[in-house]
C-alpha cells in the first residue's frame, strides 16, 4: 500500500501509522520500537495517535509521548482522533460512552467550557512538540447528533457482518453541537490563532 501511494501522482500525500492510547508511551515504545527494529526503513511520514483523556492517559503523558516520538524518530505527529464531552446528558436515550465518572479521569468537567479547555490544552501540547513536528488534530465526529439513523452502522452493514448491533448513537454528548444541532461556543477554539494559546 505504501509503495502505491508513493507511486501515485499525489506525491505529497503523507503516510500515517495510527495507534490508539496516545498518552501511553510504553505502548508506543513497544510497538513502534519493535516495528522499526524489524523494518528500520519503513516508509512513513507521520505518527498518528488517538487520544481520549478518559481512556488514554493524562495530557502530560500525551506530551511526553509525542515529544518522544518526534525527537526519537524525526517524524511528525498528529492526533488523528480525539473528543471530549460537553455534557453527561444523553440526547437519544440509548446511553453514551462518556458518562459522569469519566470527568474525574479525563481531567475536565463535561461542560462546554470543559470541552473548550480540553481542546485548548490539546492544541498547546501539539504546538510544543519539538522542531515544529506537531501537525494538529482531528476531532472525531463533531456533528454526530442524536437523530434517526445517526449511527456508524447501516442496517446493511450490520446484516453483512452478521452482527447483533442495534443502531444507536453513543457519542452525542461529545459533539461540537448541542442535541438540536446548534454550534456550541467551544467550537470557537478551532478559530483562534496559535499564538493566542
Locate the predicted segments by residue.
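Aromatic-lined carbohydrate-recognition surfaces of secreted/lumenal glycan-active proteins
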Residues: 1-29, 76-84, 135-142
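Acidic (Asp/Glu)-rich catalytic clusters
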Residues: 6-10, 34-43, 66-72, 131
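A residue-level marker of the well-folded mature domains of exported/periplasmic proteins
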Residues: 7-16, 41, 89, 165
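Feature marks short, surface-exposed loop/turn motifs that line or immediately flank catalytic pockets
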Residues: 23, 53-55, 86, 143-146
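Distinct, well-ordered alpha-helical segments
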Residues: 23-40, 58-66
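Substrate-binding/catalytic cleft of secreted carbohydrate-active enzymes
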Residues: 51-65, 91-93
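Aromatic-rich peripheral "rim/lid" segments of glycoside hydrolase catalytic domains that contact
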Residues: 68-71, 87-133, 138-197
